[in-house]
């Protein structure tokens, strides 16, 4: 034979993969046509490209790669078919929506919502999770070429396949570690913010009588100028104004009645220190400029 196991496996994988990818593109083209000509909403091409990259390709890679690897090891297509159907149902029904979508190999549960305003809100999560699935699928394909004994294969081809397996598994492991570290940090942040909110719940807060927000959208960030009238509770005076603001937004300037005021941040809690206490039921004007994601 003039070709190796690697050529044979790649031919099978690309043949099946291109067939499914072609069907996917046909379906997306039909949906895009309906979206473009029959839906009274602005047309955006980005969701179709991103869905193909993060939805279709990793799923094809991991399902086809794992299938050919199991066939090579178990040498029973019927058994592999049953195992793959069981795995698909397990990921679709039981594991897909759990563990931060890490086992959602079909891409059915993980959010892929596109916004004209902010784009993909979870781009980092998609790259890490779906990148892990893609690399694992490629590693399975290379391992199939390495373990198959159908055709003779040169030493260089074996070394290439082994290098691909090690590289892809290493990359998938690194992405997985980054992902779980980020999820752990996010969980810790939510717990910390919940505890801070529980403590702040006992603190008297001003109420907003009126507010004016000037929002400037700058790519993936926003710049906001806020002009608010705040009123103290009727029964208590305030020497500190307790406000809440997304921790991803950084306060650049803050003033009380057009005079600069000092403030402190504790995650989402913003404490504005007043030069003189705000009497009960009295009002005050606060201006603030902040920006961030």
Predicted regions and their residues:
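Short helix-to-coil transition segments within interhelical loops
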Residues: 1-7
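Secretory targeting signals
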Residues: 10-75, 108-128
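Terminal transmembrane helical anchor/hairpin motif
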Residues: 77-156, 177-195
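Surface-exposed beta-strand/loop patches in extracellular or lumenal glycoproteins
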Residues: 228-248
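A surface-exposed beta-strand-loop module
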Residues: 237-238, 248-293
